[in-house]
A protein has these predicted regions:
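Structural signature of tandem-repeat unit edges
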Residues: 1-12
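A short, polar beta-strand/turn micro-motif
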Residues: 12-88, 110-230
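Intrinsically disordered, low-complexity transcriptional regulatory regions
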Residues: 91-95
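Polar low-complexity intrinsically disordered regions
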Residues: 96-98, 195
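Short linear interaction motifs
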Residues: 99-114
Length: 230
């Protein structure tokens, strides 16, 4: 079974207790999603999860006074906590979360990409984890990062997957997807882990660069010419 598959069951159907992603009568004990294997996610019917988590491996080098190390992200839940695999608490810059190590998070607005302090459900973002030899080691984030939310009493709302997940900018759209999309000439993908074309990895959106993975976002023109630089 795909690691990001959600299974809906009635209470009279028994499955091993160690299984995740099982929804009984509208409630899931634990939902575990991952970027590994680039498997899709789809929620056909809303439910509540007592705990939900998504794991992503960040490896890129970020810039120092220049754009680099960016990638995109979209998640199906409002993120409450971000944790590095070594236990460090992470949070977007200016979040004012005590003892958290900061990372960059930006949403697309009519004015362009702007810094934000929360990662909300079904909203496309660009994201970068500080990772550069010039930074203090305590601020470098390299490896697996878990985005999670938890509510054992009322549950975390997981809504039906929208038909479209878009934010509109001054001349282009940023669209999130939970499915893989084949590369084509109408969409621009960020050059994650790709130093070719004369640009540093994670610095530009390039047309037809590669396939889109689930939980990623892509740029498309909005009636005007699209510039590739973040």
């Amino acid at each position: 079974m795909s690691p990001n598959c959600i299974v809906y069951l009635s209470k009279d159907v028994k499955v091993p207790a160690k299984w995740n992603n099982i929804v009984y009568n509208g409630v899931a004990e634990k939902i575990v999603l991952t970027a590994d294997e680039a498997k899709p996610f789809y929620c056909p019917k809303k439910f509540k999860a007592k705990k939900i988590m998504y794991t992503h491996d960040f490896k890129q080098i970020t810039g120092q006074g220049e754009s680099a190390g960016w990638e995109t992200i979209v998640l199906p839940f409002n993120v409450q906590k971000v944790i590095h695999e070594d236990g460090r608490i992470l949070a977007p810059f200016n979040s004012e979360i005590k003892n958290a190590k900061p990372f960059w998070l930006r949403a697309l607005t009519k004015k362009g990409f702007e810094n934000v302090t929360s990662l909300n459900a079904n909203t496309p973002y660009i994201i970068a984890m500080p990772n550069n030899g010039a930074y203090e080691e305590q601020y470098c984030v390299n490896g697996k990062v878990v985005f999670e939310a938890e509510d054992n009493i009322n549950g975390v709302d997981i809504l039906e997957t929208p038909n479209e997940i878009k934010s509109e900018g001054p001349s282009f759209l940023l669209t999130g997807t939970y499915n893989a999309i084949l590369s084509n000439s109408t969409i621009y993908l960020i050059n994650k882990n790709d130093n070719s074309n004369g640009f540093k990895a994670g610095s530009v959106f390039i047309r037809g660069l590669r396939d889109v993975d689930p939980f990623e976002c892509f740029v498309s023109p909005n009636g005007l010419s699209t510039k590739s630089i973040i």
